[in-house]
């Protein structure tokens, strides 16, 4: 068993050229059989493909990969993480709409960290023209060092400033998800819970990012449970050895589910119990930002499928 685990953590990362089907099959055998699965049910994860995983590869080369990772929608990332959001500006909405239709893909999300939470009116309008119920993910603004009652008051102030963006989300039928992020107002367990409690719009909630939380699978699952319907988006990404400094590729990939030490089982079982309807995005940050996580499109897709097999094993019937 120990040899099998070592093989899973090393040899798979070197076989970048194998097919996604082969990697998925190998992943299912990589030492996870001892972990408890969720009770069988009808729930299946609704995966969304992050364009940033492919760096600066063009959208035309990425869209065929959506179905290969068991997804139907794509999350467009702008610079510095990807270049696919900019393709709407350079190629035009009509061409991007045609590309999406050609591959049977829907626009499921747009990463809006650069725009911030208060400048989303145009992006919501764009999203409504290209898709339906599109999730815009961004960060919070406010005193990230506040605690206790001061933190709760800071979240209330943030929500007051957020009212125009909330109204736009409601008017356009979009979803606004605020990610818990280090050095952000929404970064601690308390801030996540209070934000979820204080939000009143059904179209606003949290993009849960385990990467920026203590690496405790039970804690992450508890936060998902406590958020309930305010949980709008899940990043399937762990901290691993971090994502700020250049690391050997094997260490960089420890952010991926099934590679690093974080147990995603509690979270996946909780999502199944909740019948979570939102997107789940298998994700990691390369260093430097904007490069593909691996050298080729097939290798990237295979790596995503490796993590997908690991996550799916927890909810397999």
Predicted features along the sequence, with ranges:
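N-terminal secretory signal peptides
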Residues: 1-12
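Active-site acidic/histidine proton-transfer and metal-coordination neighborhood
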Residues: 21-29, 61-63, 99, 103-206, ...
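C-terminal segment of N-terminal export signals and the immediately downstream linker at the start
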Residues: 31-56, 64-65
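Hydrophobic faces of well-ordered beta-strands that scaffold small-molecule active sites
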Residues: 45-51, 74-76, 107-111, 135-137, ...
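Active-site beta-loop-alpha junctions enriched in small/polar residues
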Residues: 50-54, 77-79, 112-115, 140-142, ...
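Catalytic domains of carbohydrate-active enzymes, especially glycoside hydrolases
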Residues: 62-79, 130-131
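Acidic/histidine-rich catalytic cores of soluble enzymes
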Residues: 73, 167-261, 265-268
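Glycine-rich, proline-tolerant flexible connector loops at the mouths of alpha/beta enzymes
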Residues: 76-95, 145
């Amino acid at each position: 068993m120990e040899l099998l685990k070592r093989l899973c953590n090393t040899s798979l990362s070197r076989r970048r050229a194998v097919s996604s089907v082969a990697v998925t099959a190998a992943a299912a055998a990589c030492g996870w059989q001892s972990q408890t699965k969720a009770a069988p049910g009808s729930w299946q994860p609704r995966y969304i493909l992050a364009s940033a995983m492919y760096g600066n590869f063009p959208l035309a080369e990425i869209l065929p990969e959506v179905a290969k990772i068991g997804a139907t929608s794509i999350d467009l990332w702008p610079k510095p993480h990807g270049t696919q959001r900019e393709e709407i500006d350079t190629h035009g909405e009509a061409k991007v709409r045609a590309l999406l239709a050609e591959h049977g893909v829907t626009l499921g999300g747009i990463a809006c960290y650069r725009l911030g939470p208060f400048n989303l009116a145009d992006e919501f309008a764009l999203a409504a023209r290209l898709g339906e119920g599109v999730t815009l993910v961004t960060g919070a603004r406010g005193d990230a060092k506040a605690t206790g009652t001061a933190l709760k008051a800071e979240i209330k102030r943030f929500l007051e400033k957020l009212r125009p963006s909330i109204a736009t989300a409601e008017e356009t039928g979009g979803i606004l998800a605020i990610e818990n992020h280090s050095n952000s107002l929404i970064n601690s367990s308390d801030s996540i819970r209070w934000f979820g409690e204080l939000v009143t719009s059904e179209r606003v909630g949290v993009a849960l990012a385990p990467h920026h939380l203590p690496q405790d699978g039970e804690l992450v699952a508890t936060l998902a449970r406590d958020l309930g319907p305010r949980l709008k988006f899940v990043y399937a990404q762990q901290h691993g050895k971090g994502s700020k400094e250049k690391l050997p590729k094997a260490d960089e990939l420890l952010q991926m589910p099934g590679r690093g030490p974080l147990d995603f089982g509690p979270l996946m079982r909780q999502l199944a119990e909740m019948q979570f309807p939102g997107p789940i995005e298998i994700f990691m940050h390369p260093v430097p930002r904007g490069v593909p996580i691996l050298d080729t499109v097939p290798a990237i897709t295979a790596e995503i499928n490796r993590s997908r097999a690991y996550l799916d094993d927890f909810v397999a019937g």
